Amino acid sequence: MHSREIRQSFLDFFAAKSHTIVRSAPVIPADDPTLLFTNAGMNQFKDVFLAKGTRPYTRAADTQKCIRASGKHNDLEDVGRDTYHHTFFEMLGNWSFGDYYKEEAISWAWELLTEVWKLPADRLYATVYHDDDESARIWAEKTSIEPSHILRFGDKDNFWEMGETGPCGPCSEIHIDLTPDGSGKELVNAGDHRAIELWNLVFIQYDRQPDGRLEPLPQRHVDTGMGFERVCAVMQSKASNYDTDVFLPLFQRLSELTGVTYGASMDGRQDIAMRVIADHARTLTFALSDGAMPSNEGRGYVLRRILRRALRYSRDLGCSGPILHQLVGTLADSMGDVFGELRDRRDAVERIIRAEEESFITTLDRGMEIFGELAAATARAGGRMLKGEDAFKLYDTYGFPFDLTRLLATEAGLDVDGEGFEHCMQEQKSRARSDRREKQQTGDGAGSWQWFSDSHATTFLGYDRLAMPSTIIGAAHASGHLLLVLAETPFYAESGGQTGDRGWLESAAYRMQVTDTRKDGDSFVHVVSRAFDKVRDTEIDPMDIVIEEATPVDASVERILRQETERNHTATHLLHAALRRILGSHVQQKGSFVTSERLRFDFSHFSKMTPEEIQAVEAEVNEHIRCAAHVSKHADLPYDEAIAKGALAFFGDKYAERVRMVEVPGISAELCGGTHVDNIGQIGIFKIISESSAAAGIRRIEALTGRAAEMLLWKEYHELQDVRQQLKLKADEAVAEKLAELQEEKKELEKELAGLKSASVIDALVRDATSAEEIGGCRIVTKVLEGVDADTLRSAAMALREKLPVSAGLLCSIADGKVSLAAFSSDVAVKEKGIDAGKLIRLAAAAVKGGGGGRAELATAGGKNPDGVAEACRIFAEDVRRIAGAV
């Protein structure tokens, strides 16, 4: 039975039992911050089990894509070393939400296994929880299983719990005996691959209380899971999951790419490599197809670790270049009919993986060299343990995940100091936290705060007001600045990438200029850098101002600066939406910086944007701006409601239970606490001024809006007009064509000039050579020329050997700190004297710390030591004298 048929027969079986066949949830959980990856079939129904959600059906079945590569469910380091661990797998499952219970679940499982799939009943065992008499009775009375094959186990094996508290219940597992003689009873639940679990039937009937008590649930549920690859191996009578047709297309493609056949290696090393690569290619392809991106944190780093681990194993197959991306199409072809996203995202996933491979290959080579040196040094010192700081260096400098270093160490017969590595990691994190704290401080050397209120919190009212009265509740001085905290403020404090507002605070005695507003916990700190004494009508040092308790002030934000900032902030939302539509849904915001002057937006993407893509994004944003749509700001929404309305939220971002959503209907919806325009038409113009790399896998766009964009366009227009005037272009003549024409003329003139220069150099050399030293009838020419390029030098050498019938020489040139050498030997000198320019130039080049070679008649070399040129000439001349004088 083909794997495709096995999967479909499972779904058909439960569809006939009135189950709704649901789609697999993405392997990237959309609304569960506790998970990096979907790791079980029940994940998408977790809210039902927790009584926080419902479904329009009470019976369901599916095949769920799962990844187990992090946390307690982590099979990563076992993959490849055996034949049954995977980081990606499918989980077949059926569920009852307060509908049927144990009897139906057990009876149907037995029916599918023995009557539909025809598995031998005498090889099947059912395990039950030690005091679950109900399940044991159902197995005995409602199925044909042998009574002696009903086995009881305790909490460890047969009691399922979602967490320390919450839904839980007994489970019943179905195992199959794969021993040759059917003697596997004692191997059940013993971790032996000869008696493996096929199917786990979980009966959720209790609610675990904080004190450990089990309270009956008002509704009982069924949650079952069966490993698809494992059941395929059993159904197809294969020795392992990797021998099934699930993996066959991948192994065939790997064989085409590497010339290595799975199962043919003598020591098993290449088989391990093929298993690792096949498994990891599946994980990467499915994860990226569901919107994940490799990165340096969270799930992105797990994927990067997996990719780099696979690349390391590809070396065991003789691969030195990218290979993983070439398996994406194989998966799309073999599994795309079931998981359509593999076909839909094929091209994008291939590009992402290839870019990651190419990025790591160079550092992999260098890192492998460094590891080899460290391992050799450890062995020479009689040690068996690689230092933690060395492992951290490989991680920090060459991108080697710790598990990759540990793998290499194991292969070299070494251990790695994991505690030392972790210590280095924590030290780096501490330094980073310290740096962040320093950046968040309102000023160096800030004195102690003087507080006039028990509460240090500021209420922000600046969404609707730019000016208002308030009261100072805190004050401090730091590095020439006065720092003030107000009870209420219209000033936006820097956060979410948006810079703090600027403006004025005015008390009865002082007028104070606020040049920045920053957050410090719940306090909004207004940074005063200039102040004026209203009584004396003079400017004073902010450090000299003494704030009295409960000082009232009028706070006013610079309106124009705020409006320009709002234009740029709303533009980042439009830009994000356009990037996701044009480049793909893998695009996620990775950072932003919004000021009144410009905006900067960092986003996940695997390659440099083409000019066409940049133009398309810019055009789409401007098209939206021209639509002049209203911007809706939904304050204090429940998080779930905001997500239901389509707001973007990404794993790793922290959100409160109640959020603020900024929406441009039909275009963009994001969770955002920043300030925005009321209508996107107010943005005016959007102009991208640069696109660059911010980090591996992260691109950066800088752009202008409003007046700044308008001024840039006017500046560029006037510069273009100046160029047209200088080029004396007619109205219908294009600047680019004229410049190309001028550049071509310039090249021709440079070529002509180089020819004249070369001829001049050659003429001078020939004149000088007539008086050169002569030994044994052979002229010896050595000459150092300043600023002559290598081509001219070579041409001069060729001319001299033609002009001087019996001669040998070395010409040298120094340009930009580099040395070029050209040696020649005339035909007579080669044939009758045995003077070989190719051999002699190699000896001379050593003096300039270089190398080279060529024919006996003509040879070239280069070097990086200009101070050695005289010595090179001396060596060459001495060698020619020796050879010519001996003939």
UniProtKB/Swiss-Prot annotation:
Q: Which cofactors, by name? A: Zn(2+)
Name the residues that bind Zn(2+): 569, 573, 672, 676
Q: Which domain of life is it from?
A: Bacteria
Q: Which Pfam families match?
A: DHHA1, tRNA-synt_2c, tRNA_SAD
Q: What family classification does the UniProt entry report for this protein? A: Belongs to the class-II aminoacyl-tRNA synthetase family.
Q: What does this protein do?
A: Catalyzes the attachment of alanine to tRNA(Ala) in a two-step reaction: alanine is first activated by ATP to form Ala-AMP and then transferred to the acceptor end of tRNA(Ala). Also edits incorrectly charged Ser-tRNA(Ala) and Gly-tRNA(Ala) via its editing domain.
Q: What is this protein called?
A: Alanine--tRNA ligase
Q: Where is it mainly found? A: cytoplasm
Note down the stretches annotated as region Disordered: 425-448
Give the Basic and acidic residues compositional bias ranges: 425-441
Q: What catalytic activity is recorded?
A: tRNA(Ala) + L-alanine + ATP = L-alanyl-tRNA(Ala) + AMP + diphosphate
- PROSITE patterns membership: AA_TRNA_LIGASE_II_ALA
Give the GO cellular component terms, alphabetically: cytoplasm
Q: What is known of its domains?
A: Consists of three domains; the N-terminal catalytic domain, the editing domain and the C-terminal C-Ala domain. The editing domain removes incorrectly charged amino acids, while the C-Ala domain, along with tRNA(Ala), serves as a bridge to cooperatively bring together the editing and aminoacylation centers thus stimulating deacylation of misacylated tRNAs.
> What is the native source organism of this protein?
Chlorobium luteolum (strain DSM 273 / BCRC 81028 / 2530)
Q: Which UniProt keywords apply?
A: Aminoacyl-tRNA synthetase, ATP-binding, Cytoplasm, Ligase, Metal-binding, Nucleotide-binding, Protein biosynthesis, RNA-binding, tRNA-binding, Zinc
Localization, UniProt: Cytoplasm
Which Gene Ontology terms cover its molecular function?
alanine-tRNA ligase activity; aminoacyl-tRNA deacylase activity; ATP binding; tRNA binding; zinc ion binding
Tell me the cofactor note.
Binds 1 zinc ion per subunit.
Q: What Enzyme Commission number(s) appear in the record? A: 6.1.1.7
